């Protein structure tokens, strides 16, 4: 919406490159900045940035900087206090381990702790039906609200992809919020749908 501020947040991101000074570049956040045009500082976007391209629980253990839920929560609240709209990206799927020490944090714990409603992002291609339905059923069983599905890598008129979308909607009861083609730079979606 015009005149509103937007921001991005992700609890943990792994597989990041280093700058010449040795600091890590939060790659996903940098990509979001470039594509969306938001001016939010990178350091607000993600409290945990790891070099190793592993699940966050393993990257954090190797790098000696485990995720703490309080840090994730406080960072999210600070971003929410500053911006009108905040999009939170998951780290892997809903069952992805974020920390596996005494805390045993999975992505579902982050979603629950932050009180988030979710949008399921799925590939439109082969194999998506099982993945989408299992994720949706798991989230429903654990009382994690889902608003709908966005399908990526969509090819208009592709018989299999169109059927995948139909089957996902039918089997989950969730609406398709958008079909995103490779190279799309705008997402046409009503804010009321999210």
Model-derived features: positions:
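N-terminal phosphate/diphosphate-binding loop that engages ATP/GTP or pyrophosphate donors
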Residues: 1-66, 70, 77-78
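Short, hinge-like loop/turn segments at secondary-structure boundaries
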Residues: 23-30, 137-139, 165-168, 194
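Long amphipathic N-terminal alpha/beta scaffold segment
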Residues: 56-58, 82, 86-88
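Beta-strand-loop-alpha "switch" segments that mediate conformational coupling across diverse proteins
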Residues: 169-188
């Amino acid at each position: 919406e015009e005149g509103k501020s937007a921001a991005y947040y992700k609890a943990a991101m792994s597989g990041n490159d280093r700058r010449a000074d040795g600091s890590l570049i939060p790659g996903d956040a940098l990509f979001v900045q470039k594509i969306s045009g938001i001016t939010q500082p990178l350091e607000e976007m993600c409290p945990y940035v790891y070099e190793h391209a592993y699940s966050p629980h393993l990257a954090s253990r190797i790098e000696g900087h485990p995720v703490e839920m309080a840090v994730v929560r406080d960072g999210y609240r600070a971003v929410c206090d500053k911006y009108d709209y905040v999009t939170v990206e998951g780290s892997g799927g809903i069952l992805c381990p974020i920390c596996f020490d005494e805390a045993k944090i999975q992505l579902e714990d982050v979603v629950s702790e932050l009180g988030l409603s979710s949008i399921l992002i799925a590939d439109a291609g082969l194999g998506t039906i099982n993945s989408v339905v299992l994720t949706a059923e798991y989230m429903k069983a654990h009382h994690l609200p889902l608003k709908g599905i966005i399908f990526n890598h969509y090819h208009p008129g592709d018989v299999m992809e169109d059927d995948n979308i139909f089957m996902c909607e039918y089997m989950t009861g969730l609406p398709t919020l958008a079909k995103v083609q490779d190279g799309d730079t705008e997402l046409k979606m009503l804010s009321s749908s999210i």
